[in-house]
Amino acid sequence: MTPGPPALRQVEAEIAAELAAVRPGLAAAYAAALPDARAAVLGRLWRGLLYEPLPGVAEQGPGRVRLHDGRLLTGPARLPHDLDPAPRPEDRPGAGTPRPGTADRRATEAGGGMAVRVDGRAYADPADLLAALGLPGSARLAADLERSTASLALSRAGASTRDVGREAGWEAGWKLEAFEQGVVDGHPYHPCCRNRPGFSVAEQLAYAPEHRPVVRLDLVDVPASRCLVAGPWPAELTDGDRVLVPVHPWQSRHRLPELGLEPSAAGVIPARPLMSLRTLAPVDGGPHVKTAVSARMTSHVRDISAASVRDAVPLSDLLTRAAARLGRAAPHIARYLCGAAVRVDGVPSAEVAVLLREPPSRFAGPEEVVAPLAALTTRPASGGPPLVRVLAEAAGGTTGSTTGTTGTTGSTAGSSAGWLAAFARTAFTAGLGLLAMGIALEAHGQNLLAVLDRHGRPARVVYRDLADIRVSPARLGRHGLETPPLHPRLVTDDPRHLREKLFGSLVGTTFAGLVSALGHGDRAVEARLWDVVATAARRAFDELPATDGLRADRAALFGPELPVKAHTLMQIDGGPPGDRWAYLPNPLAGG
């Protein structure tokens, strides 16, 4: 039996009603976006069911999951790195036979073209599916999936139809904020990719980056004695012996009253939200502003702890010193310049805190632009291929690149391999070099940025957001680097934890997305692209001094299993806090 389009769930209907009141012109686009939003979130949930160690799951196989109670789930076969692109006309049911070698990304079901069957009954809605499964600890996640689906449909409905890259051209000096705001769908592998509980429709339209707003930050004025300040605080945010702390307007409305605070000046810093929503680029330039927003976005409440304020500057100094030792291969580090947290009842509050960070675009030279990797692998809201494929074709045409990698797209595959090889050399040299010294980056597509030349070729990398790196005092000490006082959460000498952090983010997310976006579902091309990635990693290891630790790191990177963050598992109630990992077949195995 083939299901019809699902009826609106409660949150979907609530957003539709609010949208009709605050932005009626988007109502039709929102309704049209819902089926594909359901398919996108369902695809992420299905990935988790296929590959993560979830409670209640007994067996996992290609397109099949057996539960402990004996029920059988079936759906599209997919590899862990597969992205869920916006449906193309040729993907629609009845549109013809898929090209040979193309991954079976979507079942020929109703709804958004994606369904998972439970003992033969099809589910096209992710929240419906999870509720029917009844996995232990999954009730809150089911509600989050409903919100994620509805907000994703809103994001797609409101996204600009501007075509990233093609409209502006590299010579135009395209701005970082435009790349960031082009990431409409959020995290490519997280089922709660657009979960924003606590944000109304009006607030999402006013503050979310994909809607391209200008957000006006407030200021809270407090005596210096009532504020924890780390680093050199800027004079323009000082008034005599008082500190002016930038605050997000959502926070001013929803949290400051409960803390006994109010803005001393409202809407005085116009800024554009970046991919993370709570980090903004002031319209007039200067440091980026990372604000506290006490709401759960994707999966975490986005406060800024006192420890993060204290650690920001010394951690920036450590990374900058370590990176400098890599010479010409060094990544640029977008440093935290300073931070502040207002004391409430004598204690620095995570809800009234801020960090100021160098803008990554400062590392771009003439005729260069800086773009987060996540912006390169996402499919533009206007349709068409991911931007990285456009870049690869342009770079290949400029250089005349031929790598011998051919496939469904002919010479385009060779261009893709050439672009990927250039980026992989830079990324692995930086990531593995820092790992050898004792610093494991969380190098996923939001934190890792590429400096692109005027032809779209990767020249260097920039790393930002130091809150989730890991630091090994033992490794640092062997390289003559002293570990500053840091929160214990950041510090570990366990090589497994260091490798999970770097390999899971750089390979399991960043390169996974690039291979999927460039390979376009052609498994033969994807395999050759993974070979390109492995070759770059081998060369990066070969250029580092041979040590026992390095040899162990190398064996782990090319071992049979790759750690990948278990995003779905981490949303299940009852588990331990912190990172959880799934160990999956490693596409670099044997390299």
Q: What residue ranges belong to the model's regions?
A:
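Canonical protein kinase catalytic loop motif
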Residues: H444-Q446
